[in-house]
Amino acid sequence: SVDGAGVVLPRDGRPAHFRLHFSLPAPDPALTQWQLRFHRVEVDELRSSAPGWQPEPQSFFRPGSEDGLLPMSFQQGLPVEWSGAQTIDVVASSELLRTLRPQVVRLAQGHEQDKRNLAIAVTLYASVLVLAVVAMSLLLGARELSFLSFLAFMAASLLQMLLANGHAYALPALAWRGALGAQGLNLSMLLVCASGISVARDYA
């Protein structure tokens, strides 16, 4: 189904099939390549294809080496010789109710979008890490167990953020969680809730 701004994927894992229609100008060597982009959401598999063009499938939970260490989007470079009306078939599946929003933009524009989003994510990671270091320092200095619950809450929150952004699956130490799929996200959220309750209990 379409929500007005993208394609809504069924939450039971059934593949959604849809077709993208767009038009490209004549190739210009002075400009960067066109690319097909989707914002990064929890899809089990994302496939794009057109006559003579079939890139490797992509997955939120199993990022490839081409995605880099901190991927912020799904992207595929379009053939440089394409111009005029084009059609791409897309197949996507997810165990969660998610919306895919496709974009066809220049490579340079896509990189700028990713840089902005990555800067926000890294800032949030750094903030949580600073709070975790403060909690650990207080725990070691004051020997108060209440700081242990706060440290656990910060650690669980950082893990949840890494999983929600898909960055955990690109880290060798956490890549195994990709096998859990959407359930791994749910389990991580339960950890955040449990540690948050402990903090509320200790500081009440």
State each model region's role:
Residues 1-118:
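Soluble non-transmembrane domains of integral membrane proteins
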Residues 83-85, 97, 122-126, 151, ...:
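Generic hydrophobic/packing signal
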Residues 103-141, 145:
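Cytosolic-side membrane-insertion boundary helix
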Residues 10-12, 123, 187:
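Charge-dense, low-complexity intrinsically disordered segments
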Residues 129-204:
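Juxtamembrane segments at transmembrane-helix boundaries
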